[in-house]
């Protein structure tokens, strides 16, 4: 009897990839045979780090784990899922606001392609953590190492610091 691999996408801009994201990956991994961390090129969100830097930083976190791959995409999530043979989308939820947004997205994704969304709730101590908060703290020169997944921290700090330095000189 042949079984189908359970492939899931964990999607986001991951700018930067935080310990909250890392927690979702750790908890999603046992549920699936393969987890693709799908890094979005979003025209609707302003990102600090280039897509190649975000992908490389996340790849460094999961180097050597054959169950995890990291890929960039710039189209609809359901189109990425179809290309990769993924039948599931994993999303993290921190709040009621996140839940409402994710429920709406899940409904549309299911209507478009039949893909199912699996929601994992943030651990309580991580429910206030967001990439936006980390970027803001970085902008003001604060140490964010406690919230950024290792080894992405050093690469992100260098990229953000260089970017902020260039903006201040203009």
Spell out what each predicted region is.
Residues 1-170:
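Nucleotidyltransferase catalytic core that binds NTPs
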């Amino acid at each position: 009897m042949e079984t189908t691999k359970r492939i899931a996408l964990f999607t986001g801009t991951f700018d930067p990839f935080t310990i909250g994201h890392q927690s979702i990956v750790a908890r999603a991994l046992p549920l699936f045979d393969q987890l693709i961390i799908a890094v979005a090129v979003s025209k609707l969100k302003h990102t600090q780090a280039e897509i190649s830097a975000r992908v490389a930083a996340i790849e460094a976190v999961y180097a050597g784990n054959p169950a995890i791959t990291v890929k960039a995409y710039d189209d609809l999530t359901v189109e990425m899922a179809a290309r990769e043979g993924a039948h599931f989308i994993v999303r993290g939820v921190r709040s009621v606001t996140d839940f409402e947004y994710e429920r709406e997205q899940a409904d549309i994704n299911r209507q478009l392609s039949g893909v199912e969304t699996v929601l994992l709730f943030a651990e309580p101590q991580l429910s206030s953590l967001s990439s936006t908060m980390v970027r803001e703290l970085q902008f003001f020169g604060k140490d964010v190492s406690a919230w950024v997944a290792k080894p992405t921290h050093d690469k992100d700090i260098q990229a953000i610091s260089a970017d902020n330095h260039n903006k201040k000189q203009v």
